[in-house]
Amino acid sequence: MKQYDYLIVGAGLYGAVFAHEAKKADKRCLVIDKRGHIAGNIYTEEVEGINVHRYGAHIFHTNNKAVWQYVNQFAEFNRYTNSPVANYHGEIYNLPFNMNTFNRMWGVVTPAEARAKIEQQRAEAGITEPKNLEEQAISLVGTDIYEKLIKGYTGKQWGRPCTELPAFIIKRLPVRFTYDDNYFNALYQGIPCGGYTAMVEKMLDGVEVRLGVDYLAGKAELDKLADRVVYTGPVDAYFGYKLGALQYRSVRFETETLDTDNYQGNAVVNYTDAETPYTRIIEHKHFEFGTQPKTVISREYSAEWKPGDEPYYPVNDEKNGALYAEYKKLADAEPGVIFGGRLGEYKYYDMDKVIEAALDVVGRELA
């Protein structure tokens, strides 16, 4: 008999939910992570009394009541509502695109005036079949919004101009004809009081966790420990990149502590011009309505990913989609291994969807 029922590779949200549920069912679990901390990319660390989102802003939002009730077992959530603002050469615009944005941009006051303005610009551009992201954006929201709020930002995000990006990246752009700055139209939204790390710690309460353990480097020995493996690392790395590497976009953060109590007045400010090298600045204290004497900010830079870098976003184009489909065949045929999570499924996953997926899989596993 092996020492554990499950070896769970990755102490992020997927691994933690799986481990919590399996332990509840009296399964013996070992969770390992190659990083020196739990919670994966939702890891928060305390600096100057402020919970800093080390791997970028994470705002919990869901329409799924069961998932909301689930996370509330492990943390109390505050009422934070994501309302980012865009800074274009010192002009401030509300996001997502709504009546506040249109009023600032054109001085329009009513939804009818805003619709007319967008229609007029779409008609003037004369685009019927958008060939690239630029044409797609203009055909959806007109020239002004595109030039000031989309062009520079999106170009920085993807590392290439909008004319070279496929139109399908923005099938739709959320445009609201109400004065509503709530970015996520979700029933439930907030940030766990005390940060995400404390929440994941509670999920892993009573579960054995070993940090700084590289599964792929010690796979042969580690596999002997458990009957089943739950793998949440990169799926292509698991198979030694034998079909080629999947592409990601990476992000680089410059984080600093400032001797001021309020740097930008909002948690998230996007810099939408092409000249500013970073895409946005996060001021972490505003996620929890902090009143600390100092503040911590993170400048976020989009970066081309190369193997060895931290993978953030899968590049969901046709080429990578086809390659992942081939890896998925290998994953499905791998005996005794469950592949899950953002990297294991090569998928852009909101947190609530990760929890849904993990609960679904562990439920079937324990049935």
What kind of feature is each model-predicted range?
Residues 4, 26, 207, 225-227, ...:
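Short, well-ordered alpha-helix to beta-strand connector turns
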Residues 4-31, 362, 366:
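N-terminal Rossmann-like FAD-binding beta1-loop-alpha1 element of flavoenzymes
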Residues 20-48:
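Glycine-rich FAD pyrophosphate-binding loop
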Residues 40-41, 94-95, 146, 157-162, ...:
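Short catalytic/ligand-binding loop motif for oxyanion handling, primarily in non-cytosolic enzymes
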Residues 48-123:
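Dinucleotide-binding Rossmann-like beta1-alpha1 core, especially the glycine-rich loop
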Residues 89-93, 99-228, 232, 239:
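Active-site/ligand-binding neighborhood in enzyme catalytic cores
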Residues 215-330:
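Mid-domain catalytic core of redox enzymes
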Residues 310-367:
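C-terminal catalytic lobe of FAD-dependent flavoproteins
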